Amino acid sequence: MSFTFAIIGRPNVGKSTLFNRLVGQKLALVDDTPGVTRDRREGEGRLGDLEFTLIDTAGLDEGAKGSLTERMQQQTETAIELADALMFVFDARAGLTPNDRAFADFARRANKPVILVANKSEGKAGEIGAMESYALGLGDPVQISAEHGEGLSELYDAFRALMPEPDEEAEEDDDVEGLTEEEFSKRPIRVAIVGRPNAGKSTMINHLLGEERLLTSPEAGTTRDSIAVSVDYKGRQFRIFDTAGLRRRSRIEEKLEKLSVADALRAVRFAEVVVLMLDAQTKFEEQDLRIADLIEREGRALVIAVNKWDLVERHPGQIGALRTEADHWLPQVKGVPIVAVSGLMGEGIDRLMSAIEDSYATWNRRVPTAALNRWFEQAIQTNPPPAVSGRRLKLNYVTQAKARPPSFIVFCSRADAVPESYLRYLVNSLRNYFELPGTPVRIMLREKANPFAHKRKRPS
């Protein structure tokens, strides 16, 4: 693992803004409301030629025993243990508060190098607050504005003084396009876990990790950010994104929840396989179908996990009934894997991880040309394309354009005249023939150029 900095401090001093600035992406939610960050978040940061790991943490605040606030503090303490050095961030405009002083003592007791960061230092008020911080005894403050990108050269100097010299032999380029199929297969599978609020997404990931890495609570909406964690499951690497619960747009009122939903949608777009988690006590609802449709439109492989299976009375045929219901409501991903699980009890985890691996393999599938041609001839022979305006449509040949998801191009005489119903027939036929369950299959129509179109007709 690379050199690791944990960003700590009281709530709303700009820790997540600094995290986003150094990571170069908007990975952490940022809002003026204190306490937006709850789980600890990790990302790969870069500053000049320096590369490092960053851990963004919840604001250090006191909380009652067993409360969500106390568990947020435990997450912060874990981040400090994992870090090689700490960035203690305070709001220079606001000046030092009693909480800043208390948690400066906390940082000192960690017995790790500390970089004192005076954020929001722009303007006279910021300079005065930065000078005040010498009283903390943590050395010279690095004056920055995370929002405006000011002071980063001084922060670079502070990082450079703590970090070891880079190992030139260890430098690698994770360029997906340049990887062989074998190398690509060894990359971590990117998995997003989505669903309605309180479906048990974080509980499931905690069981995979064997620790309470993500905060859980009976209260819906505990998770706000999309949190990424690395999981080694039986020798296979996964990068799993826990996301905020997705509810109907009409029910999304608070600004923070709107930000959380947007964050979850970004996680779906970044993932390769998406696990849609249902609650076994409520099963399919309209919002679940909307989420599944979004996943299909984004071209991601889909697995359905029916969680809290330990809370329902079991009887033969339950999964079969769910399969029938899923195929009825989600024909665009017919045959999607459905796995019954209990995140709390650890039931069905092996089946779920196997389903994710299988779906990933299907999503990456390339069909041999000879087999593709055999399917194409058989599909047209079984159900010839219809006549439109008295003229028979001619489908010439098919080729696979790409995988991830499997996408094909059918060359034909009049692309705009092919009915949508016939295109659906081709998609379903291809999916069944090559066994591509639960992954989007794309077929695009393209007109074959007429080689005689440019020649002038001879006079009779």
UniProtKB/Swiss-Prot annotation:
Source domain of life: Bacteria
Domain annotation EngA-type G: ranges: 3-167, 189-364
MF terms (GO), sorted A to Z: GTP binding
Binding-site residues for GTP 1, renumbered to this chain: 9-16, 56-60, 119-122
Entry keywords, A to Z: GTP-binding, Nucleotide-binding, Repeat, Ribosome biogenesis
Any coiled-coil regions, as ranges: none
PROSITE patterns for the chain: G_ENGA (PS51712)
Similarity remark: Belongs to the TRAFAC class TrmE-Era-EngA-EngB-Septin-like GTPase superfamily. EngA (Der) GTPase family.
Record protein name field: GTPase Der
Annotated organism of origin: Rhodopseudomonas palustris (strain BisA53)
UniProt lineage: Bacteria, Pseudomonadati, Pseudomonadota, Alphaproteobacteria, Hyphomicrobiales
